[in-house]
Amino acid sequence: MSRPSRVLGLPLLSLGLTLLVSTPLQAQEAQTFRAVKQDLVKLYQSHPSTFYCGCNIKFSGKKMAPDWESCGYLPRKQANRAARIEWEHVVPAWEFGHQLQCWQEGGRKNCGKSAEFNKMEGDMHNLFPAIGEVNGDRANYRFSDWNGKPNQYGKCQMLVDFKEQRVQPPKGPVRGQIARAYLYMGEQYGLRLAAQQRKLFEAWDRQYPADRWECERNRRIGKLQGNTNPFIEKQCQ
């Protein structure tokens, strides 16, 4: 009877190890946009600064609010929305969602049933804290650089061209982070990027390398989510 028990034990041991090894990946796949917000709030308590405008972030429990005075921000039109922090998808949900069958059959709401969409929507490498008004104004517009003069949000250097549906982000680290988020999402999920957009992001990636915070953020998200952004990783070694 001892031999059969050893034979049965090996598959059971193998199964146990498989489950143990698979747990982080399964946890990653189970993450949703709603769930990861809690981890992101904790993450940014050590770096309380908004994306795009660089305003200080004030914390009250789980709630976050921008400090306009810290960055000279002035609302363009929607003061109420500008008073809160929203989690910005640098690669918009429409951009990675509309390529999926679920979106084509019923839009974003229908994609809520898709594990593939939920994984992309909840990928923390693509999520950044932004002033709500700026997040709303950016919408699904493409990033660009036409040497426009920012004048819509006080001292914030973000510029939105509503007529041409394009956005000029501030020069500096933000552009590098945008580029590496796009390049990552393209490689990680097979998203198709227009040749002109890819060329722009590759240029920004070279021009604005990862700083200390971007490296730290990447490392900590890697622990939370189970994978790092290789476009950041190679610049942090």
UniProtKB/Swiss-Prot annotation:
Q: Does the record carry Signal as a key word?
A: yes
Pfam families registered for this protein in UniProt: Endonuclease_1
Q: Does the keyword Transmembrane helix apply?
A: no
* GO CC terms, sorted: periplasmic space
* Localization of this protein: Periplasm
The intrachain disulfides are none
Q: Which UniProt keywords apply?
A: Endonuclease, Hydrolase, Nuclease, Periplasm, Signal
**Which SUPFAM superfamilies does the UniProt record give?**
His-Me finger endonucleases (SSF54060)
Enzyme class, top EC level, equals: hydrolase
Q: What Enzyme Commission number(s) appear in the record?
A: 3.1.21.-
This entry's Gene Ontology molecular function terms read:
endonuclease activity
Signal peptide feature range: 1-27
Q: Which InterPro entries does its entry note? A: Endonuclease-I (IPR007346), His-Me_finger_sf (IPR044925)
UniProt family annotation: Belongs to the EndA/NucM nuclease family.
Function comment: Endonuclease which is capable of degrading plasmid DNA.
**PANTHER family this protein is in?**
ENDONUCLEASE-1
Question: What protein name is recorded for this chain?
Answer: Periplasmic deoxyribonuclease
Native source species:
Aeromonas hydrophila
